[in-house]
Amino acid sequence: MAFCIAVIGKDNAPLYLTTSDMEQELELQYHVNAALDVVEEKCLIGKGAPESKELYLGLLYSTENHKIYGFVTNTRVKFIVVIDSSNVALRENEVRAIFRNLHLLYTDAICNPFYIPGESLTSKKFDRAVQKLMSGTA
Amino acid sequence: MQIKPIITYSGSCPLFRSLESQILNAIPLDTCEWRRTFQRPTKHVRLEAQAQQFNVAALEKYKQGDWSILEHPILHIFVTECNDVDTYKATIREAIDIWLKTLTSYGVSDWMILLVETLDMRKTKNFMPRTTVLDKIRLDFGTKNDDRCISVLNPAKFEQKSTESFRCLVQRIRFLMLTSYNRNIVKYEELIRSKREKRNIEGWDFRQYFFMQEDLALIFEKLELPTEALIQYDELDAMFSQFITHTGLNEKQQWLNHFRKPLDAFHGICLTRADKFEMRNKIRDEGVSLLEFRNYLFERQAYLLLTCNDIPEIAKRLLNFLFSTLREVELIKLECQEGALCCWEFVCALEVLQLCEQAMEPNELTCFQHCAPIWNLAKDKLYELGKLCGLLPGCTPTSEQLHIVVQLSSGIGDAPSEQHQFLQATPQLRDRSPNRKPKKSGAEQLKEALGSNQAFQKLYLELAELAISTYKHVTRLRSARLVGLDLGNFYCALNEPHKAVGFFTDLLRELKAENWHMLSSQTLLELANCYRKMGDSLAYTKTCSSISCCAELETLVRTFYFDEFLKSLKTLKTTLSAQPSIENANYCVLEDHFRILDIEVVNQKPIIQDDYILVQLKVESLYPRGVVAENVKLCYELEASSLELAMENVSLTASPSTVKAKDTSSRLKVSLQLVYKQDNRLHSAAVACDLPKSKQPVRRTSSTKRKLSPSVQADFTNFVQAENIALQPGVNLIEMKAKATRVGCWQFKQLCISMSSLEFLSEQLPFMPATFEISTKPASATLEFKTLIAGIVQPISLNVSGGSFIFPPDAKITLRCSKNLRIRQARNTDDEAAYNDDQSFESTLQVPLVQFKSFEERRIPLEVLTDMPGRKVSKHHEHHIALNCPWSRTELPIAVDFQPAMEATCRLHTCGTQKFLQVIMKGMEAHLLLQHAQVKCDVPGVQLLDLNPESQQPIEIYKSLTVTYLYEIQVEPLKTEHELPVVKVHFVIKYASLSQPDVWRTYGCAFDLVDYTTLFKLQAQLEPNELCRLRTVCNMNLKITKVHENPYTDLMYEVLNDQNLWAVCGRSAGVVSMKDVDSHSISLDVMPLSTGFLPMPSIRLSKYTAGGKSKTDGHSKVHPFPPGQVYNSTKSMQIHVIASVAGDQ
């Protein structure tokens, strides 16, 4: 369902990044990196206004083959999901569901008392769950 | 195509035609308030109209439901000029009735009856009629619609008088038109909705539906509702996409075949068409391709958005329009030439970009946000076309590629004729400068670019620069740098790597700052390629080194660049010597290649000056293979505590807390600079960088290539180092050492690893390393001894610690003893003769330090000997030894305390007139042997008798043991105390220590005997003599007898009673005079208080001096006699006291 799922820390460092197609990994990383510009733009807009409760940022930008969606947590950790543009059957509420599940997995992963905030996510359980989420079976 | 509402006329048609031009021209002259339905906001619109004669055919379409809102009449007018009531009744009323019934039968209720009046007829008749024709018409037809019956003066005949009447007519027409539109629009929307619900029925045609809904959109546009019109187009757009997306679900949509034409023509959108509905006619008549249809839709939407002055929305929609159309082309599997879609995308992008350039505030920033990715898309599409047509740098187009160019150019097509009034019609757009020539259209630019390599490169570079600058303008820096990555690759292909380096370095810096390791590795690969082409061997070496340390890259890539690194490292020295510029820094960031794990000072004892500092450095090498470092240095600096202390002492304006908050781990070595005035008052205080000028501590952080170099180099004056270290992949343990030259508290600052001529400088150390202290160890000499005993040989030890002093070959220490103290070096106990010889002790001793080296410690055993004091002067006998050492000019006095080995005291005992001398020897700390005790007296007339037994064996004494000797002193009777007041006797004894039993030394002590003649004799007697009863008063008779003549006449006696034994009843003391008598008897009363054998009460006899003889001496004085002058003969007598019997009392 998704080409790439990334978890970006609050200092814009990638904590976790996985792709379904290894050949496109470099291109997808560039897409995720460029998406941070739009994330900062949306978060900056909300800075002047009263704090928005919406964590889902929606469609960040599109390319010919991909659509990049964003989600930001209360602690400024960003989730980036890259989806195939040709998958027109995917609705926006399904993208929201992906982010919601990803948020649950992320909170479970960082509840590990041995996990140091800011370090890369190396949990095998988290990785397996995200792979399922990416293939659409979760 | 003119879109004007249709008004039909009936009745007196020639009359209406004479008024038609005036009416139709007057309608658009003013706006009319439109009260819309469904709570929509009221709007003022400007209407136009066209007139047609009444025709039933249009109404027939309306009845059947196959009507268009464009062609449907919105108002029907019946015109009449009848002013005679009778004529109206005869003919006109019937005609109106027929007309009205026809309209009603078709469900039309939008009609108006117009009565044209002529004032002349009124003037000819002098009477007022009772009812007018208008009244009759309203009575007959306008029962509920009075406003639909109106009369007007004929403006053709009475221009001046009919102005007001005509204006009312025009207003009424506008109002009725809008009212009709309310009803017609609602009905038309219902018709569209019913048509849409039948879209799955076979035979349904999207094109017919499209025209129906577009008609509604056109009406909305005409009524100045572009937003409503846009909604219609958006709905059509979505429905079309949905049909194409689900085209595989069923095969009923035969109308899709109309859009399956090959894409022979792929011109892009054009927002400045002269005829906006040219494509609409083509869709209706000939049929168009999918691309053309999509272009038409987007053009209509863009036009409506432009009318709303929402240009950013056009830019926002473009990318989605392009991408969704590409998906649709793919879905229905259209055949098209390779590169055709790229051309289409390019032309569309440039068309919108040119429109956005004319946007004005406040749309400018939002427009730029959406324009930036469009510029990027145009650049990307141009690149793809260049690749296809052989226009990339280094390529030459082949004949086949030239053919492709020709085909693409024909497919792009010619630009349609532009409407130049378009710009003037929209004043919201920014006017162009007259000096600027009009821009070419996207199609023309693309054709020109595809024509030659130079034109292609020029356009590509221009688009890339525009994309970068626009991204930067809207602060999307990451996207800007990604465009820079593409541009850098293009410059590399152009063989201009010096231009590409800047883009790659910018991207690398940002990716490294945010820890995107994989992308950083890819950028490093690009940089290495650039530096190799540029011939910048230093930068190439550094980049190869960084690449080989990237864990994200494959091992083969890392190994290849590692070999390149080693290869170029050898040639680096030659290159650097050729370029001695300071800007060409040969520094690298150490953290990119090594990881500092631990720094530990391994010296076990404190570090002494000129000693070696041993440091163990744990470093992890990230290279794929082993590498040899020529030099590994770790510099250290003084801690800033001294500076803080200095700053605290200065009276600055800053508060002390501010000074104390100074960071002690400052990376720059700074010093305090104080400027004083001539009168020594402080003028200013500053903090300056304390480094030699030859070194540059801080370098400018360049914006191009030197950004990745360390910015601060620490002071490497003091460092520990190791040379020629082989660093293997993984953890390496490096032993480093250096000589400690300066004293102070030090802290490590920076690590530097040198290879050939490349230096890897670390940033701040990853942890706070432990500080270490270097101290000077001075040379010292001390005397070590335990409790020293006077009189026998005592061992001491001279401990010499060299410290950091450099000893001369003939160095020696001179020990000078105080008086009566002697010293010698310790002798071997085997040589007993020399050991027992006291002559070897000297008052001054020189100890040679043979071959004494620095930091050597030597222990020299010595022996001291001092005489025992003859008298008990003090508890400790103080001596001192002065040390004269070669490292010091002054003598070092060391106090030495001696305790006596033993001490002697004497007591004088009296028995009548006989005198006995008792000498008591008490052992102290030493274990001694005593023999041959003698008492000598040199005074003639005095004889001493030795009463001690003869003993052959020496007497052994030790601590707390006493030995007593007894001698009798006999003085000749002729010698009186008057002639010999003092008898001096000498006590001499020989002693030896247990360790030296054969060495006998003499100990002598002198005693003075004074007051040794017995003067008085005391005798006490109790009565009854043998039986004293408890608590019974007894009589004690005290007799004082003068034995020897003496000057003391007045004596005082005192009974010293024990409170538990005796109680004195009556006087216990008194004064007697012995002036003329030799003896005196005193009677005292005493009472025993205890039973048993009680000692006699003690009596003390004293000399008494009366105090009343002179005025100055008013008190009497009592001086006890020395024990040698009074003899108490009954001192040790005991009295038996028995218990009293109650009956005897």
Curated annotation (Swiss-Prot), chain B:
Question: What is this protein's name?
Answer: Trafficking protein particle complex subunit 10
Q: Which UniProt keywords apply?
A: Cell projection, ER-Golgi transport, Golgi apparatus, Transport
Q: What does this protein do?
A: May play a role in vesicular transport from endoplasmic reticulum to Golgi. Has a role in one of the several mechanisms underlying dendritic localization of Shal channels.
Q: Tissue range of expression?
A: Co-expressed with Shal in the nervous system.
Gene that encodes the chain? SIDL
| InterPro entries assigned | Ig_TRAPPC10 (IPR056917), TRAPP_II_complex_TRAPPC10_C (IPR022233), TRAPPC10/Trs130 (IPR045126), TRAPPC10/Trs130_N (IPR056913)
Cellular compartment(s): Golgi apparatus, cis-Golgi network; Cell projection, Dendrite; Perikaryon
* Subunit details: Part of the multisubunit TRAPP (transport protein particle) complex. Interacts with Shal (via C-terminal dendritic targeting motif).
Give the family per the record.
Answer: Belongs to the TMEM1 family.
This protein's GO cellular component annotations are: cytosol; dendrite; Golgi apparatus; perikaryon; TRAPP complex; TRAPPII protein complex
GO biological process: what's one of them?
early endosome to Golgi transport
Q: Taking the first listed entry, what is the main subcellular location of this protein, grouped into a coarse class? A: Golgi
